[in-house]
Amino acid sequence: MLLAPRKTITPAILGVVFGALYAALSLVRFYRFDPSSWDNAIFEQGIMGYAHFGAPIVDLKGPGFNQLGDHFSPIIALVAPFYRVFPSAQTVLMAQAVLIAISVAVIAHVAIRRLGQIRGIAITIAYGLSFGIQSAVQSDFHEVAFAAPLLALAGAAYVDRDWPWVAWWTLPLMFVKEDMGITVAAIGAVLWLAGQRRRGAVLVTIGVVGMALVLFVVIPHFNPAGGWEYATKFGGDRSVLDVALDQPGRKLLTVVLTVGITGFLAMASPWIFLALPILAGRFVADKEYYWGTDWHYSLVLMPIVFIALIDAMNREHKHPWLRAYAAQGAAVALAFAAVMQLQSPLSVLGKPSTYDPNPRAVSAREAISLVPKGASVETDIGLMTHLVTDHKVYWLGTADNPRPDYVLFDTGSGLGSPVDAVAYAQGIHGGIWKLVLAKDGYTLAKSQ
């Protein structure tokens, strides 16, 4: 069915607006040298390898380390053509902003088409401002950014009961990350429940078998240790049950917030079952940062719960009270989103102090400028995102790093980096080193 021009243009406008917000937040953090983790640098090194028609070598994980031995995310190669033309950390950050913005446009498209202009826009705004998306943008690039548009597209096809396209949009998830097979299998189970027995069974089989092959064959093949190093995160040194029962209040809050942003209406759609294995996997992992709502771990849940919301509002419900409540679902979701903005990552864009000059950023740029392009440098999380594009970068926490040309540390951001760069370099790498710069907590030493 053809859409009215306004119903076609509005989703695109919403996608562009939110994409601009995500890009602005990413770039502001980048130019202010606000480190979140080393992940953006890791993915840039991997994408750089693909961009030059080679393997995704990530020296930050170890000299010559193939990223496919860490996480199976070959889909990031799709960023490589853009990176080849615009080689920079900002290109990687913009890729994530664009991918999430596409998911916003997809959510808007199906919501407006199924629920009308006003309710559709309200749901889209709530989705675009959701905590899972904002936390992911704040955490810099991660491969799961590719899952956002794919899950939105598969979900939109589910709302339309377009079963073939549900399957087609689901399959690429296998190339996003090694554990996405469980989500593929969950979508297959939902299709099975919807009466699509053959398609459902195929997706379940592909998800389970494909995930097993990746975890036990592909990743061990590329990993120097011959295994999947994250296997020990489930239970860790404790039993899985002990971990599952740890901090129940925190985990319950994560669940409540995840479905609460839809006014709990998402629970009225079978599509919400996709969230169960994702949350379960996080809650039995012995890493406390998996249990909350920070970082990028809730990004994949956002298109799931909002598609479930749209599907729930689009369904015919037997109970009058549920029909009445579903009619107000968009308003409830928007109200929840408004309350959540008070301390949200995007809120910093409205604060004048965000744009004040950062003296340490000036010193950081000076330190980086003293490292010639193409030189090798051992560094910490505070500066690696800004160094990777033009230098061969190693992380100080990786064993067996070769002797670099420079060591550069950020000792002023509480990362625990060595205060005396010369003493560190001589102790770890030997030889003679000269202090080049010590300013505002940045220390740079050069090999002689």
Where would I find each of the regions flagged by the language model?
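Transmembrane-helix signature of polytopic, membrane-embedded enzymes
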Residues: A12, I102, I107-L129, A148-P149, ...
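Membrane-interface transmembrane helices that cradle and orient dolichyl/undecaprenyl
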Residues: E143-F146, L151-W165, W192-G195
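Hydrophobic/aromatic-rich transmembrane helices and adjacent perimembrane loops
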Residues: F273-P320
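Membrane-lumen/periplasm interface segments of specific transmembrane helices
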Residues: L21, L25, R32-P35, G49, ...
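Signature aromatic-anchored transmembrane alpha helix within multi-pass, membrane-resident enzymes
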Residues: A12-V16, T205-V209, E316-P345
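Start-transfer (signal-anchor) and selected internal transmembrane alpha helices
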Residues: M1-A24
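Extracytosolic helix-loop segments that constitute the early lumenal/periplasmic catalytic or substrate-binding loops
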Residues: I42-N66, P74-I75
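Aromatic- and kink-enriched transmembrane "portal" helix at the membrane-lumen/periplasm boundary
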Residues: S73-A80, A89-V106, T124-A148, L153, ...
